[in-house]
């Protein structure tokens, strides 16, 4: 085996590791506010609000300027390109607002999924071209971590070996480019909850996918201490008739992670995958209470599961700003407790919090 030429200096490694640790400090997780213009259009449409740049800015500002109760809950915020360059009403750029509240600024860098020809509707993710230059610019503009989402589907013949290998490789290339530019990569191989598969099948597929991802990261000389993983929880498919307890979901999830994710990885920030706000908090809490050894921080990187009630409360009306922020603060506090295994559902969750956020074949 040839000598491995070091990809990163000790200083670069320390910077990456420090950033990753800040994002997943105890009690902290990530607000995913990086919906593309097309995705946010659906959210705004659901409350009868026009998808204009100002409405998008106002809504993101609502989340980013919630009062200081969220500061100990939110370690990082993932933004969409447009949002990184928008400003709050007081003239402060959004990255400055996030940093003033102790958060790390993140940016979505992938360019969406594209079909893999010759597969049964499987995809890979595009966006590697020019990524190094974009990362260098984003770093200058205040971003310290990034996100790239790959999508896999469970079916009779999926995910195929080709889809698993291709997506693992593209995640590794992305991670390598980020680290060279001082940006911590969040590696997101999402296995969609679509389908009628049971818990065991999801666990099996999750293990196979994560094993392939970490083999690719090793092949590409990724510094694991300077990365975060954003996986799905192991859950039954949405059309599965059998019901599983939160404890069973937690056990299957932690078991799959223990079998595949090296302890060197700083943190695991779960995606909510269309679970209701309440369900996402309860499952995260159960995962943290699972009686197995867990060497990584296990926390949240939630979009809809932090925003659904806030979005409804806002309803596109400026006068509802405070009420909407209150809903967001509630979910942030709940998930901050859940990532420490200290969340007790109050039974007072509003209707919006208990509503399933599942979207078939979810494109982000």
Curated annotation (Swiss-Prot):
GO terms for molecular function: actin binding; cadherin binding; cytoskeletal protein binding; fructose binding; fructose-bisphosphate aldolase activity; identical protein binding; RNA binding; tubulin binding. There is a cross-link at residue 42 (Glycyl lysine isopeptide (Lys-Gly) (interchain with G-Cter in SUMO2)). It is found in: Cytoplasm, Myofibril, Sarcomere, I band; Cytoplasm, Myofibril, Sarcomere, M line. InterPro entries: Aldolase_I_AS, Aldolase_TIM, FBA_I. Changing residue 347 to S: In GSD12; likely benign; does not affect thermal stability; 4-fold decrease in catalytic efficiency due to reduced enzyme activity. Gene3D superfamilies: Aldolase class I (3.20.20.70). The modification N6-malonyllysine is found at residues 111, 312. Beta-D-fructose 1,6-bisphosphate binds at residues 43, 272-274, 301, 304. There is a cross-link at residue 42 (Glycyl lysine isopeptide (Lys-Gly) (interchain with G-Cter in SUMO1)). The record marks 364 as: Necessary for preference for fructose 1,6-bisphosphate over fructose 1-phosphate. The modification N6-acetyllysine is found at residues 42, 108, 111, 330. Thermal denaturation midpoint (Tm) is 54.4 degrees Celsius. It catalyses: beta-D-fructose 1,6-bisphosphate = D-glyceraldehyde 3-phosphate + dihydroxyacetone phosphate. NCBIfam families: FrucBisAld_I (NF033379). Homotetramer. Interacts with SNX9 and WAS. Interacts with FBP2; the interaction blocks FBP2 inhibition by physiological concentrations of AMP and reduces inhibition by Ca(2+). It is linked to Glycogen storage disease 12: A metabolic disorder associated with increased hepatic glycogen and hemolytic anemia. It may lead to myopathy with exercise intolerance and rhabdomyolysis. This is Fructose-bisphosphate aldolase A. It comes from Homo sapiens (Human). The gene is ALDOA.
């Amino acid at each position: 085996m040839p000598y491995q030429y070091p990809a990163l200096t000790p200083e670069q490694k320390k910077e990456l590791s420090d950033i990753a640790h800040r994002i997943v400090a105890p009690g902290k997780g990530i607000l995913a506010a990086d919906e593309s213009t097309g995705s946010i259009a659906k959210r705004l449409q659901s409350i009868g609000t026009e998808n204009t740049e100002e409405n998008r800015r106002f809504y993101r500002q609502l989340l980013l300027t919630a009062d200081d109760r969220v500061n100990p809950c939110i370690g990082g915020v993932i933004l969409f390109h447009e949002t990184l360059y928008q400003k709050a009403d007081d003239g402060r750029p959004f990255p400055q607002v996030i940093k003033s509240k102790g958060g790390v600024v993140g940016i979505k860098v992938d360019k969406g999924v594209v079909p893999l020809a010759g597969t049964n509707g499987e995809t890979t993710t595009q966006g590697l071209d020019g990524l190094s230059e974009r990362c260098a610019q984003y770093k200058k503009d205040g971003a310290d971590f990034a996100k790239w989402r790959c999508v896999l589907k469970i079916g009779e013949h999926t995910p195929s070996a080709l889809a698993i290998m291709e997506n693992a490789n593209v995640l590794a290339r992305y991670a390598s480019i980020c680290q060279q530019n001082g940006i911590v990569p969040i590696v997101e191989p999402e296995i969609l909850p679509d389908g009628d598969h049971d818990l065991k099948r999801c666990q099996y597929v999750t293990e196979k996918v994560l094993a392939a991802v970490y083999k690719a990261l090793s092949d590409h000389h990724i510094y694991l201490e300077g990365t975060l993983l954003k996986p799905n929880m192991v859950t039954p498919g949405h059309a599965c008739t059998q019901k599983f307890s939160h404890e069973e979901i937690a056990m299957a999830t932690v078991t799959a992670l223990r079998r595949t994710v090296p302890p060197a990885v700083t943190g695991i920030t779960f995606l909510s995958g269309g679970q209701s706000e309440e369900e996402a908090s309860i499952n995260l809490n159960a995962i943290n209470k699972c009686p197995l050894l867990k060497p990584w921080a296990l926390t949240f990187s939630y979009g809809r599961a932090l925003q659904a009630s806030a979005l409804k409360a806002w309803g596109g009306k400026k006068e509802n700003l405070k009420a909407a922020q209150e809903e967001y603060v509630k979910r942030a506090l709940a998930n901050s407790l859940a990532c420490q295994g200290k969340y007790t559902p109050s039974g007072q969750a509003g209707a919006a919090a208990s509503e399933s956020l599942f979207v078939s074949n979810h494109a982000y």
